[in-house]
């Protein structure tokens, strides 16, 4: 089955290609009565869109969203919500040299073997341009989660290439082109990215994503554990090569006496679990880290083959991100929001009447 739909109760089906007429999504299962306007969605799209600094692709897209259905008199109706984003700045001539060849590190080779055809213009369906539709859907999910639970989802870049970025405060994230929670290192990062671009190469990135004010109880053991679904969602983002929940791989070097989050009447004493135990949310902040590989489209010539298997040397021309991770924060936020709203609706469907006497201690440590 084609893998274009995400979620079980809050489902999102995306469509479109990088150089097609446009892209978008159909959201089904959104609860009725949510106040929703195009401006609610546009905010996150503007954070993701290309051409916002010299450190990202210079493709100029306004990414203006249109709500085609599912909203009446400013509120969702409970029927499918159709969102459309038109492409306006395609430059397909940049990709003529790869029509009969495969770019190293890209999906060209695998799409060709799977489908027997491919849209080589900007990567077609495999392009990160598709994530604009996910960000649009995620904006709807984020608004519902915030109104229902007060949930706030924040992502920021913690490393670019070999440059680790110190955390100085979330107020800095929107003030620089790196989505960095930092002020003092921005000039250093600017110079570093300029050098990467001039070298005709690219670098990867690491991001941290947090969700605060998540209710306790979300997650469906054993196969639809909340952490498993978050990892699935994050790995579905283009170029993501690694996911950590909570302490992640650092758990290997921790002792059990340190890693296990102790409980007190006043709250948890730590959050090595990343807000999830047994696949179910604890009510603490959900903490996720993702690793993003270097952009595969670079102007440095590399070895490859053509569709007949002949050896070639290929350099990728066009407008590309020297670090695709710099625009990934809104995408990661959106995917986490889509997981949380889907599980919130699933929990409500089965367990809305469940009540226990034990206090929600994660709320008491806020």
From Swiss-Prot:
Gene Ontology cellular component terms for the protein in this record: cytosol
Superkingdom field: Bacteria
Pathway: Metabolic intermediate biosynthesis; chorismate biosynthesis; chorismate from D-erythrose 4-phosphate and phosphoenolpyruvate: step 7/7
Catalyzed reactions: 5-O-(1-carboxyvinyl)-3-phosphoshikimate = chorismate + phosphate
Sections of the chain in a coiled coil: none
Molecular function (Gene Ontology), one example: chorismate synthase activity
Keywords annotated in UniProt: Amino-acid biosynthesis, Aromatic amino acid biosynthesis, FAD, Flavoprotein, FMN, Lyase, NADP
Xref: Pfam families: Chorismate_synt
GO BP, one annotated term: amino acid biosynthetic process
Record-linked InterPro entries: Chorismate_synth, Chorismate_synth_AroC_sf, Chorismate_synthase_CS
Residues spanning the signal sequence: none
Residues that coordinate or bind FMN: 125-127, 238-239, 278, 293-297, 319
Binding positions for NADP(+) per the UniProt entry: 48, 54
Assembly, per entry: Homotetramer.
Similarity remark: Belongs to the chorismate synthase family.
Biological function: This reaction introduces a second double bond into the aromatic ring system.
UniProt name for this protein: Chorismate synthase
Species of origin: Neisseria meningitidis serogroup C / serotype 2a (strain ATCC 700532 / DSM 15464 / FAM18)
């Amino acid at each position: 089955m084609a893998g274009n739909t995400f979620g079980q109760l809050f489902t999102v089906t995306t469509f479109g290609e990088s150089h097609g007429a446009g892209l978008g999504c159909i959201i089904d299962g959104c609860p009725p009565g949510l106040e929703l306007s195009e401006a609610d969605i546009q905010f996150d799209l503007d954070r993701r869109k290309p051409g916002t600094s010299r450190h990202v692709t210079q493709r100029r897209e306004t990414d203006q969203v249109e709500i085609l259905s599912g909203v009446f008199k400013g509120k969702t109706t409970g029927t499918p919500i159709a969102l459309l984003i038109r492409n306006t700045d395609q430059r397909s001539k940049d990709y003529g040299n790869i029509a009969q060849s495969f770019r190293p590190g890209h999906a060209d080779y695998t799409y060709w073997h799977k489908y027997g055809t491919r849209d080589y213009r900007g990567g077609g369906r495999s392009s990160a341009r598709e994530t604009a539709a996910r960000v649009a859907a995620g904006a709807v999910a984020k608004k519902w989660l915030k109104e229902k639970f007060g949930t706030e989802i924040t992502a920021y870049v913690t490393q670019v290439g070999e440059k680790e970025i110190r955390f100085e405060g979330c107020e800095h994230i929107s003030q620089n082109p790196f989505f960095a929670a930092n002020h003092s290192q921005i000039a250093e990062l600017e110079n570093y990215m300029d050098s990467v671009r001039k070298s005709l190469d690219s670098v990867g990135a690491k991001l941290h994503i947090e969700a605060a004010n998540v209710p306790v109880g979300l997650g469906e053991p054993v196969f639809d554990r909340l952490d498993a679904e978050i990892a699935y969602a994050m790995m579905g983002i283009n170029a993501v090569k690694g996911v950590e929940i909570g302490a992640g791989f650092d758990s290997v070097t921790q002792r059990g006496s340190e890693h296990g989050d102790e409980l007190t009447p006043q709250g948890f004493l730590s959050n090595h679990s990343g807000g999830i135990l047994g696949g179910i949310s604890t009510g603490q902040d959900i903490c996720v880290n993702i690793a993003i590989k270097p952009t595969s489209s670079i102007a440095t010539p590399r070895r490859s083959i053509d569709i007949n298997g002949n050896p070639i040397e290929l350099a990728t021309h066009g407008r590309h991100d020297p670090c695709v991770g710099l625009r990934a924060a809104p995408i990661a936020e959106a995917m986490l929001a889509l997981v949380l709203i889907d599980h919130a609706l699933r929990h409500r469907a089965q367990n809305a009447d469940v009540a226990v006497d034990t206090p929600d201690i994660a709320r008491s440590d806020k």
